[in-house]
């Protein structure tokens, strides 16, 4: 397992466990439009990735992070990978708070994971690889987000766009 991928999985999983052991901790981490825009709790744009709605939510996100993280981190390096992950999470959070109601609470790292899919598209195109499977996986995940209530598809879309843009900029030939 690549070092930054391992670190992210360890920290996110550790916070999930901490939230189980310390009731009320999650309330200081999750994303909510009112808390960010009206109370200035901007840390939530990133800390939302440390929270999850259950063990299966955590498992699926960490599995996706493991698969995408190892591949991308190997291809683009630790610093750029971490930058894309964090930028994607911020983009996901901004999309969520600007396009959701004030009372909506959002949890999870899936916005950042979708950002990694956006980065994977950029990397795949750069190396002339087929992107059809990536588009299919993204489409299936968006469909799930529309079918099942409580999934923040706005964050997924924001993360995907932010990851694509971040990778396009960070991996441009003049920056590489």
Label each residue range with its predicted role.
Residues 58-65, 107-119, 152-171:
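Alpha-helical transmembrane segments that form the membrane-embedded catalytic/substrate-binding core
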Residues 74-79, 83, 120-135, 171-176:
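Alpha-helical transmembrane bundle and helix-membrane interface signal
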Residues 87-88, 133-142:
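Central hydrophobic cores of alpha-helical transmembrane segments
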């Amino acid at each position: 397992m690549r070092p930054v991928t391992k670190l992210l999985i360890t920290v996110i999983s550790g916070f999930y466990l901490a939230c189980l052991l310390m009731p009320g901790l999650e309330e200081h981490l999750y994303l909510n439009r009112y808390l960010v825009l009206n109370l200035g709790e901007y840390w939530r744009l990133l800390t939302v990735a440390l929270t999850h709605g259950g063990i299966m939510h955590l498992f699926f996100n960490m599995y996706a992070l493991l698969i995408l993280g190892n591949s991308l981190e190997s291809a683009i390096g630790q610093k750029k990978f971490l930058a894309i992950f964090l930028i994607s999470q911020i983009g996901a959070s901004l999309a969520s708070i600007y396009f959701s109601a004030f009372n909506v609470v959002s949890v999870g790292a899936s916005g950042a994971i979708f950002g990694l899919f956006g980065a994977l598209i950029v990397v795949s195109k750069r190396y002339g690889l087929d992107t059809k499977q990536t588009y299919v996986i993204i489409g299936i995940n968006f469909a799930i987000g529309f079918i099942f209530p409580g999934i923040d598809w706005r964050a997924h879309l924001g993360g995907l766009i932010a990851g694509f843009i971040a990778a396009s900029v960070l991996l441009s030939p003049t920056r590489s």
